[in-house]
């Protein structure tokens, strides 16, 4: 009996020792993880701070460029920046933050940042491990953003975000001037769909026999048209460039004005029964259904 009791006590002591060792090992592992995390946080914070020998330049889009206070042996200023935890380096003749910086990721893909001489344009490009460009993003200080994706060195999709927040998106792209699908999104999530042909974007929306069409030139100039295939009581539309207004008429009488404002919204205002003057006040079209109702 004493032998059994002694054996049981020995097993219990061994179990306690193992648990204690596991606990210590687990604690050490946690301490190492915390230490590693702390080091990474410190390194990331350090990357976002200028060294004693650097000046910091804050760009309009939130990026920071660190510029050496003195020129290097080649007579240029050294540049440094961190984008998506990738450290980029480069040189420049100027010390204002402009220039080109490059860096590599662990998978050998690359990131390239170009800041224009006037600091008003920032271009971010991504390359795969074989050095083929896969995407680019051009951000301008006035507010527009152009994003492109490429496949096998060919343009695959493109998105233009205007300074007012409205967008133009292209997919199934043949070349820079032609795309099978184009989508324009105005304020209030109003979408018009079409295509890009010969550099001109044509998007439209249909309601019954009426088609509202927007033509957008390369330079961004817009014209709006209205077409009606009805046999009788056909609607017509007249576009006025100076006011960005489409006046809709039926039976030779003006019925309403659609105004395409610079902020990307559309307003509608009715004419009186005689069609001679506007009445009431213009109201903002809040969704696609309201726009379709305005075309009825």
UniProtKB/Swiss-Prot annotation:
Region annotation Disordered: where it falls in the sequence: 25-51
Compartments it resides in: Cell outer membrane
Outcome after substituting residue 132 to P: In strain: CA8
Lipidation (S-diacylglycerol cysteine): 16
Effect of residue 192 to F: In strain: CA8
PROSITE patterns attached to this UniProt entry: PROKAR_LIPOPROTEIN
Basic and acidic residues composition bias: residue spans: 28-39
Pfam families: Lipoprotein_1 (PF00820)
Membrane topology field: Lipid-anchor
Signal sequence coordinates: 1-15
Name of the protein: Outer surface protein B
Organism (species): Borreliella burgdorferi (strain ATCC 35210 / DSM 4680 / CIP 102532 / B31)
């Amino acid at each position: 009996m004493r032998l059994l009791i002694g054996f049981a006590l020995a097993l219990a002591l061994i179990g306690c020792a193992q648990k204690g060792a596991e606990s210590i090992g687990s604690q050490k592992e946690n301490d190492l993880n915390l230490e590693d995390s702390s080091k990474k946080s410190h390194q990331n914070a350090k990357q976002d701070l200028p060294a004693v020998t650097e000046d910091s330049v804050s760009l309009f889009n939130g990026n920071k460029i660190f510029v050496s206070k003195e020129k290097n042996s080649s007579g240029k200023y050294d540049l440094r920046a961190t984008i998506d935890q990738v450290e980029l380096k480069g040189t420049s003749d100027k010390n204002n933050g402009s220039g080109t910086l490059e860096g590599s990721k662990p998978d050998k893909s690359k990131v390239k940042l170009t800041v224009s001489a006037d600091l008003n344009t920032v271009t971010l490009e991504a390359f795969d491990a074989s050095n083929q460009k896969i995407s680019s993003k051009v951000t301008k200080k006035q507010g527009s953003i152009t994003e492109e994706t490429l496949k096998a060195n060919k343009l695959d999709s493109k998105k233009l975000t205007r300074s007012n927040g409205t967008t133009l998106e292209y997919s199934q792209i043949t070349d820079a001037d032609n795309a099978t699908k184009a989508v324009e999104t105005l304020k209030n999530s109003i979408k018009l769909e079409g295509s890009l042909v010969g550099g001109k974007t044509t998007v439209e929306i249909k309601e019954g026999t009426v088609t509202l069409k927007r033509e957008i030139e390369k330079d961004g100039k817009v014209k709006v048209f209205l077409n009606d295939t009805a046999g009788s009581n056909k609607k017509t539309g007249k576009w006025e460039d100076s006011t960005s207004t489409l006046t809709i008429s039926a039976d030779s009488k003006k019925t309403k004005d659609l105004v395409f404002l610079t902020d990307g919204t559309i307003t509608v205002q009715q004419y009186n029964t005689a069609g001679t003057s506007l009445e009431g006040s213009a109201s903002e079209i809040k969704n696609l259904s309201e726009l379709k109702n305005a075309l009825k």
